[in-house]
A protein has these predicted regions:
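A short helix-loop-beta-strand connector motif used in the catalytic cores of GNAT acetyltransferases and
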Residues: 64-80, 110
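Conserved GNAT-fold acetyl-CoA-binding loop/helix
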Residues: 41-66
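A conserved beta-turn-beta hairpin within the catalytic core of GNAT-like acetyltransferases
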Residues: 98-111, 121, 143, 168-169
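Conserved N-terminal entry element of GNAT/NAT acetyltransferase domains
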Residues: 1-31, 39-42, 181-202
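Conserved active-site alpha-helix within GNAT-family acetyltransferase domains
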Residues: 127, 131, 139, 143, ...
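Conserved beta-strand in the GNAT
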Residues: 80, 86-95, 110, 115
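Glycine-rich acyl-CoA binding loop
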Residues: 81, 122-130
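Active-site acidic-Proline motif in GNAT/NAT acetyltransferases
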Residues: 117-119, 123, 151-152
């Protein structure tokens, strides 16, 4: 644990799990994250994500580079959860300048990743990590953040909704090729009815 983080104590009211230590995860120990990232992508693949997933051999190098870039900017941060010296979960929070449209306070914060080892799921590790993330945000004067959840990841959605999160945005994904060629909806798009067509935004 000492090499990967500081092991800050949990704030009053934050969840704890016996034998689990939560602390900072720095850019020098991102290689420990790869199995947890792979587990997250495997879970999405098993859930039949709407958007095709990038193969592991491409996905992790890209994600690792993104984490490295985020963790050197001074505002974004990552936390890890360790049991017996082994990383069993992690969370990455991107902290950016305030949004120009939506009021987000002095900064805009987004949870970009939260993953727990498959054998540790259901033990409260995600709750411990998210409590620690929120403690850190509150200490910086930030009282809100957003999370992107894959449409098919119902378990994650329920987890965040239990914490009070609600739909704020919808990110729609569409395929241009084919639709323009034949004037038909892309694969997977709902059929258009006279009623829905009348309420379009053209």
């Amino acid at each position: 644990m000492s090499a990967a983080g500081t092991g800050e104590g949990a704030a009053a009211g934050s969840a704890t799990v016996e034998g689990v230590v939560v602390g900072s995860l720095d850019a020098g120990h991102l290689d420990d994250v790869e199995p947890l990232w792979r587990a997250l992508i495997d879970h999405l693949r098993e859930s039949d994500s709407v958007v095709e997933l990038v193969p592991h051999e491409l996905s992790w190098p890209r994600r690792r580079a993104m984490y490295e870039e985020m963790l050197v900017d001074g505002d974004s941060f990552a936390l890890g959860a360790w049991r017996d010296g082994r990383l069993i979960g992690y969370a990455v929070m991107r902290v950016m300048p305030p949004d120009p449209v939506w009021y987000t306070g002095t900064h805009f914060a987004e949870l970009t990743s939260l993953s727990v080892a498959p054998e540790e799921r259901g033990a409260g590790i995600g709750t411990v990590l998210l409590d620690a993330v929120e403690d850190r945000l509150l200490a910086r004067g930030l009282d809100q953040y957003c999370i992107g959840v894959d449409t098919v990841n119902d378990g994650a959605r329920r987890f965040y909704e239990r914490r009070g999160f609600r739909d704020g945005f919808h990110l729609l994904h569409g395929w241009i090729a084919g639709r323009r060629a034949v004037g038909a909806p892309a694969p997977g798009a709902p059929p258009e009815t006279p009623e829905t067509a009348a309420h379009g935004e053209d």
